[in-house]
Every structure is written in structure tokens, then in C-alpha cells.
């Protein structure tokens, strides 16, 4: 799928396209079979907005499992699929909601899994929010590299884009365009209406460049936004 163009003149979240939905068929070097991690591993930190101390454990998952979050601190340990149908809020982060259970600020974890080309994983968390760590997905990448990746028996499923796909949200001044292509390519333009930053562009031509090109990008905030965010009960852990 490419090029994908995201135009975000305001403070919007950059979305990632996963490799398993980005190409019509596996290209050279692209995994044919699904993958998961070799073993469980835990990382701890503080939630950006809630300020809660949280333990996050990555666990191997079976084929066709996808990405799921489990709130082990809640009765029944509810599981929330990392699916767009369960997105409940995108204010300063992405929050998944299912049957009353919530997990927030999931974007860096999911970006790391996509960047590592991991298809199946269960994330157990004992709080309402994923730890922010250094504000990027790099610590999650490095953590997953420590346990390694294992290939599974089932083949990956690839979505074939037959025609241009567009999305526009005038209220958020966001535009997205997906164009059929035999190559993986993502192009992003963002403009925060800042004289200091100006208009910024970024491109990714191979998901395996994610660690070196994208993973270290960190969440930031403008100084003039701090009071407003605090008034909205946010960035308690920032």
C-alpha cells in the first residue's frame, strides 16, 4: 500500500500501516508466515496521562490471535482487541474500550510490534495505561529484540488494495490517501501551525527501517499547551 499520505495540520496522531495489510503479495524478504515472540518479558513505567505505575508484560500468542490487551488488574481479566472498532478516544493518545474496560496510550506499543513484524502478541497490563517510558517506541523495540521472534505455521494474510482509498476528517483537518502499489511506502506531512517547526515530512520505504528511522521519534508537547492539558486531567506522568 503506498504511497499513504497523512496530512495533519493540527496535533494529530500519525498512524502506521501494517505489513500484513500493506502489500498484495509477499515481496522478497517479507515474512510469509505469521510470527510471535519466543518468550514473555515485562517492562515497568508510568502512564503519561494517568501518572499510574504500570507493569506491562508481552506474552507469545497463537496463530491468528493478532494484538490483544488484557487488564489483569480488573475482575475477570478482560481482554481488549487492538481493533479500530474498539477505539473509544483519540484525545492525546489512543484509548481502546470494550465492555467497560479501557487501556490508553497504546500507539507506541503497537508501532513497535508492527516495526518488528510481529503478528501475534498478548499484552498484559495491570493499570489503565501503557507506560510512556522515554516517549517513543524504541524501548519496546529493544525489549522485544531481547526475547526474539519465532515463526509460526500459519501463513500471513495480505489485503489487496484494488483502488484508491481516501479518508478526510474536516474537524481535525486530517486527510489520508492509500494508493495500490507493489511496494511498501508511507509518506507523512504534518503541520502544527508553528513558526518553529514549520511543515515536516517523513517517508518509510521498508518496514525494516522502522527501528532506525521512526522508532526513536518521541511524544512532545508545546509549552503553551501545558496548562490546558493539566486542566483536562492529562499528562500527570509527563
Tell where the protein language model's regions lie, with residue ranges.
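Short acidic-hydrophobic catalytic motif
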Residues: 2-238
Amino acid at each position: 500500500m503506498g504511497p499513504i499520505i497523512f496530512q495533519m495540520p493540527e496535533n494529530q496522531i500519525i498512524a502506521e500501516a501494517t505489513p500484513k495489510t500493506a502489500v498484495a503479495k509477499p515481496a522478497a524478504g517479507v515474512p510469509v508466515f505469521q510470527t510471535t515472540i519466543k518468550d514473555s518479558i515485562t517492562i515497568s513505567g508510568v502512564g503519561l496521562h494517568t501518572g499510574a505505575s504500570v507493569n506491562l508484560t508481552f506474552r507469545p500468542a497463537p496463530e491468528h490471535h493478532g494484538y490483544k490487551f488484557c487488564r489483569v488488574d480488573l475482575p475477570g481479566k478482560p481482554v481488549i482487541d487492538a481493533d479500530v472498532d474498539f477505539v473509544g478516544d483519540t484525545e492525546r493518545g489512543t484509548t481502546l474500550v470494550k465492555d467497560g474496560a479501557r487501556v490508553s496510550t497504546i500507539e507506541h506499543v503497537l508501532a513497535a510490534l508492527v516495526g518488528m513484524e510481529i503478528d501475534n502478541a498478548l499484552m498484559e497490563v495491570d493499570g489503565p495505561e501503557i507506560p510512556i517510558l522515554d516517549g517513543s517506541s524504541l524501548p519496546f523495540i529493544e525489549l522485544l529484540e531481547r526475547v526474539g521472534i519465532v515463526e509460526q505455521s500459519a501463513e500471513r494474510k495480505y489485503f489487496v488494495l484494488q483502488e484508491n482509498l481516501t479518508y478526510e476528517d474536516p474537524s481535525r483537518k486530517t486527510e489520508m490517501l492509500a494508493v495500490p502499489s507493489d511496494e511498501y511506502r508511507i509518506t507523512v506531512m504534518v503541520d502544527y501551525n508553528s513558526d518553529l517547526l514549520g511543515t515536516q515530512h517523513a517517508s518509510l520505504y521498508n518496514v525494516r527501517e522502522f527501528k532506525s528511522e521512526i522508532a526513536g521519534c518521541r511524544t512532545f508537547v508545546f509549552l503553551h499547551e501545558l496548562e490546558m492539558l493539566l486542566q483536562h486531567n492529562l499528562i500527570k506522568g509527563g
